[in-house]
């Protein structure tokens, strides 16, 4: 069996990792052993934060909806309860968009929720 020299593949693998580590600070962008660890950790952070991003945006939407709802003398939880009772199927992203960019439409949605709450009581 003939001898296999691994220099080409090793260099390619190292180059790939060092390219992924471009822009990192100090040895993390220059030394293969450290860069490899940094790239792996960056991948773990990226994976985790793709999940966290969804939670963060949902909480941002809730904060925006709550702020806009309180301007109409109703709390966030009462608004959501009223919308559920009224059968309005707007998600929090859509409600937040209305609250920020279309205040008249949001006011109409709030009135619908208030009417549903008043009807039940």
Curated annotation (Swiss-Prot):
Question: Membrane-spanning residues where?
Answer: none
Instruction: Report keywords, A-Z.
Output: Ribonucleoprotein, Ribosomal protein, RNA-binding, rRNA-binding
Q: Which GO terms describe its molecular function?
A: rRNA binding; structural constituent of ribosome
Q: PROSITE patterns in the record, alphabetically?
A: RIBOSOMAL_L20
Q: Does the keyword tRNA processing apply?
A: no
- Highest taxon, organism lineage: Bacteria
Q: Name one GO cellular component term.
A: ribosome
Q: Which GO terms describe its biological process?
A: ribosomal large subunit assembly; translation
Asked whether the UniProt record includes Ribonucleoprotein among its keywords, one would answer yes
InterPro entries attached to this UniProt entry: Ribosomal_bL20, RIBOSOMAL_L20_CS, Ribosomal_protein_bL20_C
Instruction: Say what the protein does.
Output: Binds directly to 23S ribosomal RNA and is necessary for the in vitro assembly process of the 50S ribosomal subunit. It is not involved in the protein synthesizing functions of that subunit.
Into which family does the record put it? Answer: Belongs to the bacterial ribosomal protein bL20 family.
Give the matching HAMAP family: Ribosomal_bL20
What this protein is called in its record is: Large ribosomal subunit protein bL20
Query: Which species does the entry assign this protein to?
Result: Francisella tularensis subsp. mediasiatica (strain FSC147)
